[in-house]
Amino acid sequence: MDHDYEKLGLKVGLEIHQQLNTKRKLFCNCPTKIRDDEPHGEIERVLRPSQSEMGHVDKAALLESKKEKKFIYQYYNDSTCLVELDDEPPHDVSPEAVDTALEVSTLMNMKMADEVQIMRKMVIDGSNTSGFQRTMFVSQEGFIETEYGNIGVTSLCLEEDACKKIEDGKDYTKYCVDRLGIPLLEITTEPDITSPKMGKEAARRIGTILRATGKVKRGLGTIRQDVNISIREGARIEVKGVQNLDLIEKIIENEVTRQISLNEIKEELLKRNAEVVDEIKDITELLKDTESKVLKSALKNKGVIRAILLKGFSGMIGREVQPGRRLGTEFSDRGKVLGGVGGLFHTDELPKYGITEEEVTKLKEYMNCGENDAVILVADKKNKVERALNAVIERAKESMIGIPEETRKALDDGNTSYLRPLPGAARMYPETDVPTITITEEKLEAIRNNLPEMPEEKLVRFVKEYELNEDLAKQMVMSYHVDLFESLSKKYSKIKPTLIATTLEATLKEIKREGLDTDLLTEEHLEELFKGLSEDKMSKEAVPDVIKGFIENPSKKLDEILEIKGMSSMSVDEVESIIEDIINQNISQVNEKGMGAMGLLMGRCMAQLRGKADGKLINTTLQKKLKEKVQ
C-alpha cells in the first residue's frame, strides 16, 4: 500500500547488531565459534528480576519472570568455559574488539568516550546465564552519508551476544552457550529516516562500513536489525530481529499500515461507545458437549472454557490491520505471550472450528451479547485462561485509546507480532567485576592512521587494477573472500584476476547448489589450487572438478586430487598427439565437411582432454591440425 509518509510524520530509527570476527570472546579466551555437534553437558537455571541502581524493576524483565520458566544451557568442555556459565568472573575485555569498535566509530564520524564503563543490562528471558547482558558505551553523535542525505548515529556500544536458542517448551527454554560472549556492536541511529526505502539504504550503508573493516562475521544470524517505527498519530514500536536487509522496507510499510488501521478502529469504537467488560465468565458447563476438537481437548485435559464480553466490538475483531493479520490476531498474540495459551476464538469468526451456530447463539445469550457486541473465549488450564483473558482485556482497552508502545517480533512475511512491552532504563546498572577502559589520544591516532579502504574506493580500484567488469567488481568488493582475492591475484600474476574472482564468487556458489559442503574448502586448498594453475599442473577448465575433489577429500594435496580425478596436465606434444588421433578416427567427416567438422571434433577433443589441457590450447591445436588435413 502506498502512503504519504511525509504527511503521516513517519520517523524510523535503526539498531544494528553485528557480531565481530575476533580471535576470542569479549570476556574470556574461548573461540567465537558456533557449533552444531552434540554438547558435552547441560545445566539448569531459574532467573528472577532485581532492582536497578535507582531501585526500580524493569517492566519487560518483570513480564518474563511471570512466565515461571526454567532454562537449560548446553555447553562444550573444549570451547566454552565457566565465564559463559556465570560460575567464574569475567576476564578483561578483548582489546581486538575494543579496537574494532573504535575503528567503526571513526568511520561513522563519532565522538569517542574518554573512559568506557561496562554496564549490566537486565535480561531474564534466559538468553544470558547471568540474567544480564554486559554492554559498554563507546561513542556517540556521529553520522553516515546516504543518497537520501545524512543520517545521525546516536551511539555505538560494544556488548556480548546472547545464547543460541535451541528449543522452546511450555515450561522451559533450552539454549547453547557457544554464542554467548561473542563480541557484538550495537549501532543506534537517530530517527532521521522518513521512508521505507531510506530505511533500507541506511541499513545497507552501515553494513557496508562494517564489512569494510574485514573484522565482522558473515552469514545468517551474524547481523540483526531492530527497527523503531512511529507516525505522528501513532506510537513508537520496536521491531526486533530483522535478519534480511530486503525485509526492512516491507516491515516499515506494514507497520505504518498497522498503525493507520488501529487508529481507524479506535475512531469506530469511540463512535460506538464501545466498552470492555472486566468480568471473566466460566462457560465450561455451557459448552461441555461441544464437538469442537480444540475445546474437547482442553476439557479432556481438565481445562476450562471462559469468555469475556466486548461491547461495540462486533466486526472490529475480524478487521485486517496488516496483510493477513487482524485485530483479533493482536488480541491472540497477547494471550499467547502472557497466558501461554494456544490461541482464542471470537464471535466475528464463528461458527467455525467445530463450534456450531446453535452453540454460538447459546453463548451470546449467556453473555448478554448484543448485535454490535463480541465475545472472546479461551480454553486451557484455569490459570493460563485467566492470564490470557486478562491480557486480552488490557489490549482491548488499549484499542480504544490508540496504539500501545511495545516490542514486536519481525516475521518472515514482513509483518510483526507482539513480543513484550517496550523496555525502560530501569534495567541498567554498573558492572563491578570488570575495570573501566581508558581511551587515549594515542590509541585514536593509531586507529585513524590505519582506516580501511571504503567499498566505493575499492570498486574503482578493482575495475582499474584487476580489469574486472563492474558487476564482478561489485560482487568481489562485498565478498567474504575479498582479501583472499587480492592476495591470490598479487601472488599469481600469471593467472587472470577475472578467473580468480569468478572462481571465488560464482564457481563456489554453483558447487554449493549441487549439494556439496563448500565450508570444507579452506583458504589453504584455494591457495594450492591457484599455485598449481600458475605452474601449469592443470588447466583452468579443471578448476570446478579440483574444488569438488578437495571437498570430497579435504586431507589430500593437489597432486593427489589431480591423480584421483585423472586431470594431471599434459604436455603440448601429448595434446597434439591425442588431437591427431581424434582427427584420424573421424576422417570421413573431415573429408566430407572440411573445416565444417571443427565443431564435432572440438566436442570430442574436450571430452577427452577437459581438465588436462587449456581450452585455448586445444582449440588452436585442433584448428592447426585440421587445416593441415584439409589442405
Curated annotation (Swiss-Prot):
Signal peptide: none
Cross-referenced Pfam families: GAD, GatB_N, GatB_Yqey
Gene Ontology annotations of biological process type: glutaminyl-tRNAGln biosynthesis via transamidation; translation
Gene Ontology annotations for the cellular component aspect, listed alphabetically: cytoplasm
Catalysed reaction, written as an equation: L-glutamyl-tRNA(Gln) + L-glutamine + ATP + H2O = L-glutaminyl-tRNA(Gln) + L-glutamate + ADP + phosphate + H(+)
Molecular functions (GO terms): aminoacyl-tRNA ligase activity; ATP binding; glutaminyl-tRNA synthase (glutamine-hydrolyzing) activity
EC number: 6.3.5.-
Database matches in SMART domains: GatB_Yqey
Enzyme class: ligase
Matching InterPro entries: Asn/Gln-tRNA_amidoTrfase_suB/E, Asn/Gln-tRNA_Trfase_suB/E_cat, Asn/Gln_amidotransferase, Asn/Gln_tRNA_amidoTrase-B-like, GAD-like_sf, GAD_dom, GatB_C_1, GatB_Yqey_C_2
Membrane-crossing residue ranges in chain numbering: none
Keywords: ATP-binding, Ligase, Nucleotide-binding, Protein biosynthesis
Role played: Allows the formation of correctly charged Gln-tRNA(Gln) through the transamidation of misacylated Glu-tRNA(Gln) in organisms which lack glutaminyl-tRNA synthetase. The reaction takes place in the presence of glutamine and ATP through an activated gamma-phospho-Glu-tRNA(Gln). The GatDE system is specific for glutamate and does not act on aspartate.
Assembly notes: Heterodimer of GatD and GatE.
NCBIfam families: gatE_arch (TIGR00134), PRK04028.1 (NF003107)
Family: Belongs to the GatB/GatE family. GatE subfamily.
Protein name according to UniProt: Glutamyl-tRNA(Gln) amidotransferase subunit E
Native organism: Methanococcus maripaludis (strain C5 / ATCC BAA-1333)
Name of the gene encoding the protein in the UniProt record: gatE
